[in-house]
């Protein structure tokens, strides 16, 4: 069972229940100022301190992104890199990639410009989705990164060398794309920490992504009544 089916199931069964919550340290809240030091939430300067989406909206956003990808030529087996801090858009983008049958490639947000280029070329990514904090690092090698790749920017004031995520998905269908995905299809590439050299790419099938989610749930014993605090970076 591909992990995307869990999202679609929850959207059907619990459409109006909250699925994701983002707390933005750029909007101070005296009850949560200790979060600021972690710098793990994508800046959203024109949004309130707290943003949230329901399961149905989560799934719709993933579908819109998936349909946008397909419309731009992304197909099963292609690779889409994600270079963003933790934010409300991160998981809908990740699941949107999976829904196309493409392979999600999360990048460590600590990568410098050369490491980004190295990993993009090593994984042979077809698209890089990045946030505001990474404009400078992407721009450093924008000419090489944009050769044969699409650069998609998530945020306000889109740089000239990229295309705007929000504009691209605005008119896309919220229905799931008609793509068959099996447990044996490849779903993600995660990179090693690179402590002994440049990071190494590790390819995962959908089956391993599903099993990881199941093991996490069993380990923590969580249920739909619980709220799971995600402090670690989502690329990990």
What are these regions (language model features)?
Residues 52-56, 187-211:
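Conserved AMP-binding A3 loop
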Residues 15-18, 170-191, 198, 221-227:
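Conserved pre-ATP/AMP-binding loop-to-beta segment of ANL
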Residues 59-64, 170, 202-223, 228-235:
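Conserved structural elements of the adenylate-forming
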Residues 5-8, 71-72, 99-170:
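Structural core segment of the AMP-binding/adenylate-forming
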